[in-house]
Amino acid sequence: MPKVFLQSLGCNKNLVDSEIMLGALRDFEVTDIPKEADVLIVNTCGFINSAKQESIRAILELCEIRKKGSILAVTGCLMQRYKDELIKELPDVDIFSGVGDFGEIDKMIAGKLSKFSDETFLQKNENRVITGTNFHAYIKISEGCNQKCSFCAIPSFKGRLKSRDIQNIVSEVEMLVERGYYDFSFIAQDTSSFGRDIGLKNGLISLIKEIEKINGVKIARILYLYPTTTNKELLQVIIDSPVFVNYFDMPIQHINDEMLKIMKRGNGKAEILELLQTMRAAKNSFLRTGIIVGHPGESEEYFDELCRFLQEFKFDRISVFAYSKEEDTASFEMKQIPQNIIKKRLNKIAKIADRAIDESFRALIGTEQMAEICGFSSEGEFFYGAKLAIWDFEIDGEILINESELENVEVGGLYKIKITDFVGGKLLAKIIS
């Protein structure tokens, strides 16, 4: 059986696309050793400069170590964004493809053909291979974005919002439930806009109601809410849901009114605060956000306001990014902030974020929680790694459970645990039942 090596870079939306490719390549044995592979695939990220550099390095490394006669394919966002330049600059790559043909990768490999379709998503896919877990899956509900954020180039290569049909999404979840999956994270560039392009006024609410009807879905969460398309009605539907947990992931990017205007984020500070307070008031809520520092126009005064806000409003998780100057964005032509200042601000805000995350972890000590066993931990085979049921898979932390204390524990199982300590950035716990 021929072997395939697939390197998936970037976000969890890219991971879904990679899993679709693995589904199309079921006749191949998957290997994590590139030198053994007959086919090598890099699914690239082209969002910001650091991600682009990582993608290029990965491609060049595989060009160096691939075995003679193997096929190297490069797919994904970077290819979609810089198609002409990369085809010219990477003569050792055999197949090029963008973001619309993942389900056709087997045909492209068989014919050694490159392909770039106008479509940037798949409506329906029945052969996807879920990686890394036997209980959790990401479900992509739309592709593209209608927002006009000043710093973001995604609409330039992903296109405008294109929502999947609700029944197609339901069918995918039902299929995965039949295969044993029970925990689902619903993702998109802007999940709260779902359905607006196909005439659904409250598309995400409608989707939530349909997912709740599926027998076997135990846990679900929504990622990537956008402030201007999120309202209290949607939040209340999540809060009242018997299936969707009170997990609120809404990147705010900044909190200063003038910066929000410069960044073309739509809502101002007051509207964002109202949404965040509603989220925080929900029982057992978990709040995640994203912040950009160093965007053109960010004065010391605006930055200080952001720092004070993050110290006062306690998020559970904060992802912090340095502004990246990107072509095809409004901020590309703006007066840029020097890199040394951006780096200084990034370091300061990262420390604030780390303290907030640390406090969120420590607040769990002594509590009883529902958790899922993910497998042996990153610390080695003496511990099982687990995540709280409310957390997203991999990104929100790992809980260590001593393997020697356990009998008949099932990987992928849902258990009641007691958090006992927080050591070295990780929670320790024991299974109660």
Swiss-Prot record:
Belongs to the methylthiotransferase family. RimO subfamily. GO terms for cellular component: cytosol. GO terms for molecular function: 4 iron, 4 sulfur cluster binding; aspartic acid methylthiotransferase activity; metal ion binding; protein methylthiotransferase activity. Binds 2 [4Fe-4S] clusters. One cluster is coordinated with 3 cysteines and an exchangeable S-adenosyl-L-methionine. Its EC number is 2.8.4.4. [4Fe-4S] cluster 2 binds at residues 145, 149, 152. It is found in: Cytoplasm. Residues 131-362 form the Radical SAM core domain. This is Ribosomal protein uS12 methylthiotransferase RimO. PROSITE patterns: MTTASE_N, MTTASE_RADICAL, RADICAL_SAM. Keywords: 4Fe-4S, Cytoplasm, Iron, Iron-sulfur, Metal-binding, S-adenosyl-L-methionine, Transferase.
